[in-house]
């Protein structure tokens, strides 16, 4: 496809409700740092990981293959500002309002692409173990930002206060330019000091352990177990919503502490 089509896709993504959008090559995404490190990370269970029909965690080696004909991947981001916390409130089996918005954005954008550009598209599950991808890595490859000291995607426009989804495209699209953007180099990292469980206090990963030089939180100082413990506590402190489902309000202190993208 011509560059004109890529520009059309990114413009259409915003018309369909995305705050940001970018394009990456499937081959590049499949070799992203998280994909390379995944099999070396040990136990990957916890809050937000998928389970089967018997409520058992799905083994991380069980990763469905993407369609062979898929050549490109579109990443869409939705701004999640501090004054709209409800976008991220988990409400039982229905997930979060923000994720439902992203699903609809991807669906309508896919329909537009198939009609206007005559190319096939394929939905992606949120979970890697069910055919999804590591969305932060994909977003970096799609030119949306960089991975910060808080192990989150940092965008120039909104900092880490975005939520992501993606889908696959049969067409071989030109990827969006990678961003020359690194706001963390001279930052005192308030995201780390504000963490209530000090999940980013001490390095727990090395490049040798994970088989990639790009390790979590840049220097390996991201303890997923501690972060997961905070999320478990958030679940225990959840409130019952109008639908009688527990409404979980997960910690976002490291997001709010980040100065990037603030007015």
Annotated model-derived regions:
Residues 84-85, 90-263:
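Catalytic cores of enzyme domains
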């Amino acid at each position: 496809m011509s560059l004109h089509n890529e520009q059309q896709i990114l413009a259409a993504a915003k018309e369909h409700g995305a705050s940001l959008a970018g394009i990456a090559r499937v081959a590049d995404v499949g070799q992203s740092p998280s994909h390379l490190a995944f099999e070396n990370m040990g136990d990957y269970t916890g809050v937000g990981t998928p389970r089967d029909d018997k409520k058992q965690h799905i083994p991380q080696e069980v990763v469905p293959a993407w369609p062979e004909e898929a050549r490109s991947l579109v990443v869409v981001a939705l701004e999640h500002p501090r004054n709209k916390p409800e976008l991220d409130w988990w409400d039982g089996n229905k997930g979060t309002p923000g994720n439902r918005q992203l699903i609809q954005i991807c669906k309508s954008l896919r329909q537009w692409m198939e009609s206007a550009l005559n190319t096939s598209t394929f939905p992606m599950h949120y979970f890697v173990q069910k055919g999804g991808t590591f969305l932060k890595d994909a977003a970096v490859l799609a030119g949306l930002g960089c991975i910060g000291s808080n192990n989150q995607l940092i965008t120039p426009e909104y900092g880490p206060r975005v939520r992501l989804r993606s889908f696959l495209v049969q067409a071989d699209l030109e990827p969006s330019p990678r961003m020359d953007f690194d706001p963390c180099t001279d930052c005192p990292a308030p995201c780390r000091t504000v963490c209530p469980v000090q999940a980013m206090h001490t390095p727990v990963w090395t490049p040798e352990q994970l088989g990639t030089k790009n390790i979590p939180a840049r220097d390996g100082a991201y303890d997923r177990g501690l972060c997961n413990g905070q999320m478990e506590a958030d679940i225990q402190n959840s409130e019952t919503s109008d639908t009688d489902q527990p409404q979980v309000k997960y910690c976002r202190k490291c997001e709010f502490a980040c100065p990037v993208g603030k007015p």
